[in-house]
């Protein structure tokens, strides 16, 4: 009899657990709201955009939904949208997920929120028609693959960016000029790999590291001035480029093998560094 009662109690507890589980799922689902093509949530008096299914081509994302400020956009919220041509994001946004606009193939221009300090992982990856994006003075970091494959992007001015991540501009085949400013320190691995039209790069005083394969395959790159603060030149960082003349400053104490491998146009190289590694 005791065993039967114990079994019955277990069944009751299991049933209660299942009911609780379904209640939690239902409660979570009930937190979604829908307005003008936006799916969003509300929490602590603030709105987060989960996704957008509208058909607008020129989109101004609202700063307020359901009377609450829009402060966040979740990962992939606009990804693979073939309709979008231009987007204005409100400056109320303080956080974004990854791949928010990835593979938006017809996106040409974007106003990026002033309140963000970075461009997140794969935010614009595969946006083949993107030609215009504002990089405000608040942006300090460009994360990995943020603009990878943006084949129509031609020019970049990065006023306060301190570092760029791996593959951040890889395969941007129309990119011809990039300007960095005071405070910049780090060029990530393969960040400009196969930017075949890149001709002009300005690396300011303060730049310390050019990482692996950073400019590999930049066939049009003929000249680059290395700042006197440069310390690390990583392997293959200028492999297969069009460099003609280089001067490596005394500040370079860590230069790895194959930095200038297959630079077939290289006519003159002056090396003043102190240590060669690898």
List each model region and its residues.
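Bacterial N-terminal signal peptides
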Residues: 12-23
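Short, flexible turn/loop "capping" segments at secondary-structure junctions
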Residues: 52-53, 125, 148, 193, ...
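Extracellular, surface-exposed repeat architectures
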Residues: 51-53, 168-170
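N-terminal secretory signal peptides that target proteins for export/translocation
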Residues: 1-7
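Consensus positions within tandem repeat domains that build extended binding/scaffold surfaces
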Residues: 74-77, 97-100, 120-123, 143-146, ...
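Structural signature of tandem-repeat unit edges
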Residues: 37-45, 54-71, 82-95, 104-118, ...
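Sec-dependent signal peptide cleavage junction
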Residues: 21-33
């Amino acid at each position: 009899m005791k065993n039967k009662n114990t079994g019955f109690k277990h069944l009751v507890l299991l049933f209660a657990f299942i009911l609780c589980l379904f209640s939690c799922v239902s409660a979570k689902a009930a937190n979604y709201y829908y307005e003008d093509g936006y799916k969003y949530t509300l929490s602590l008096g603030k709105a987060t955009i989960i996704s957008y299914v509208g058909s607008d081509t020129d989109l101004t994302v609202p700063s307020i939904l359901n009377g609450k400020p829009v402060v966040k956009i979740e990962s992939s919220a606009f990804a693979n949208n073939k309709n979008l041509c231009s987007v204005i994001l409100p400056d109320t946004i303080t956080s974004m997920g990854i791949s928010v606009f990835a593979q938006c193939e017809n996106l040409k221009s974007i106003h990026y929120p002033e309140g963000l300090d970075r461009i997140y992982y794969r935010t614009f990856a595969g946006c083949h028609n993107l030609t215009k994006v504002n990089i405000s003075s608040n942006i300090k970091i460009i994360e990995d693959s943020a603009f990878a494959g943006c084949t129509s992007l031609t020019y970049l001015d990065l006023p306060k960016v301190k570092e760029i991540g791996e593959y951040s501009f890889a395969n941007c085949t129309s990119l011809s000029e990039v300007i960095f400013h005071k405070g910049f320190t780090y060029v990530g691995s393969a960040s400009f790999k196969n930017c075949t039209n890149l001709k002009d790069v300005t690396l300011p005083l303060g730049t310390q590291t050019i990482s692996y394969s950073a400019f590999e395959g930049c066939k049009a790159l003929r000249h680059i001035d290395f700042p006197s603060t440069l310390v690390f030149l990583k392997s293959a960082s200028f492999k297969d480029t069009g460099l003609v003349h280089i001067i490596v400053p005394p500040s370079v104490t860590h230069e790895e093998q194959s930095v200038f491998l297959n630079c077939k146009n290289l006519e003159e190289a002056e090396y003043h560094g102190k240590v060669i590694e690898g």
